[in-house]
Amino acid sequence: MRFGLAAMAMLLALPAAAQQTSGSIEIESMLEGRKTITPDWQAINALPLGDKGNPVRVHMPPGQRAYLSRLVCTGGGTPNFSRIGSFGVGPYGTIVDAYNVACGANAARVFMDMYHPNYVERRPVPGFTIRDP
């Protein structure tokens, strides 16, 4: 039984390699706890990753910082980032935050949804590449 639980935990922690196009996901709301939802994947995936309507999914502030720390600028450098603030409810029904992410004079606004337990995004937002977690 322990092996089965350990194997399940490892599978749940695997990073996402491609955009999700169907099915339900688990979110963790500060007020409601964990719950399962079925997002409008067609509407979400019609927008670029990092848009307010397609925020980068992470788990809590450490997940936000971990994702942003893995981004790579065009020249190979590491971007600077700072939190701008919260921007209301996103497509998953939870609050999204925005970060300013800059490579020198080039800056982008990246929206993130931190209420996705056990989710690690492997895709970069437009304009960046990303290192493996």
Predicted features by range, described:
Residues Q19-I95, C103-P133:
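N-terminal secretory-pathway/extracellular module detecting exported/lumenal segments
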Residues A13-P15:
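N-terminal signal peptide c-region/cleavage motif recognized by signal peptidases
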Residues M1-A6:
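Bacterial N-terminal signal peptides that target proteins for export
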